[in-house]
Design a protein with these regions (language model features):
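Active-site acidic/histidine clusters and adjacent loop/turn architecture
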Residues: 20-21, 25-65, 69-75
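Inter-helical turn/loop segments and adjacent helix faces that build the functional surface
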Residues: 30-38, 128-132, 201
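Short histidine-centered catalytic/ligand-binding loop motif
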Residues: 40-47, 123, 133-138, 199, ...
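Soluble extramembrane domains of integral membrane proteins
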Residues: 68-73, 80, 84-97, 148-165
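Aromatic- and glycine-enriched beta-alpha-beta binding-site module
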Residues: 81-140
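Compact, glycine/acidic-enriched structural inserts
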Residues: 114-172
Length: 226
């Protein structure tokens, strides 16, 4: 996983291409060293380098927000994990704090896989103790939190969703009941199949614009990093 140096500059991402999709399906169907080495130039030119360029464009949004890391994954699996397949089937970009385990903390992300792309905000598995802290924070100023939710959903045009407790926690007011039911997998995510809109620099503009609208939500949950 490569870190992105945050330097101010021009837009670097020029877009993916149909060959990107061909490689992603190819590695899914032929996940072995011989096939990968034969197609390594395709990986570098059509998948890794464009993803790294998009990561650098995203990093520019965080130049004035110290403490955020922008990471770009690589295709090679960690051999220490003893996975039966040597290569991943997707690449992703992740914006997060310098934390021990990403899944317990909020992040902004972009992912490209054989079926398409996804990007947005995700908070996969917050600790129960952290969710309790979040509920207390919400209760301190419900109007401020509800405004954050409304503003985010209005700006993005998408709902903020979450995995719910089977038995929701008791909320101090009716307006907070939906949020006291949150257990994890809190997200606001765009899913797109590959199309002409994927191939070109406009994708980078679209991704950066969407992630920028999610920064206030991301900042709120970053108060509870572990």
């Amino acid at each position: 996983m490569a870190g992105i140096t945050q330097k101010e500059g021009s837009v670097l991402f020029e877009g993916y291409c149909p060959e990107t999709v061909d490689f992603l399906w190819g590695i899914r169907m032929n996940n072995n060293r011989d096939w990968f080495l034969e197609h390594k130039k395709d990986y570098v030119n059509h998948l890794y380098e464009p993803t790294k360029a998009l990561g650098k464009d995203i990093a520019q949004m965080f130049l004035d927000k110290p403490g955020n890391l922008v990471k770009v994954s690589r295709i090679y699996r960690d051999a220490r994990l003893h996975h039966p397949l040597p290569y991943k089937e997707s690449l992703w970009i992740c914006v997060r704090q310098d934390v021990e385990w990403w899944a317990e903390n909020p992040c902004l992300y972009f992912e490209i896989r054989p079926e398409g792309i996804s990007y947005g905000f995700f908070y996969y598995r917050p600790r129960p103790s952290v969710m309790e802290q979040i509920r207390k924070k919400i209760a301190e100023n419900p109007k401020k939190f509800l405004k954050l939710i409304r503003d985010t959903e209005k700006a993005t045009g998408l709902p903020i969703t979450a995995e719910l407790y089977k038995r929701p926690k008791e909320a101090p007011t009716k307006s907070l009941e939906p949020f006291y039911a949150w257990k994890g997998q809190i997200g606001c995510v765009v899913d797109e199949e590959f199309s002409e809109n994927t191939f070109g620099p406009e994708l980078g503009v679209r991704v950066c614009d969407f992630l920028k609208k999610l920064i206030p939500l991301y900042d709120f949950f970053n108060q509870f990093c572990v």
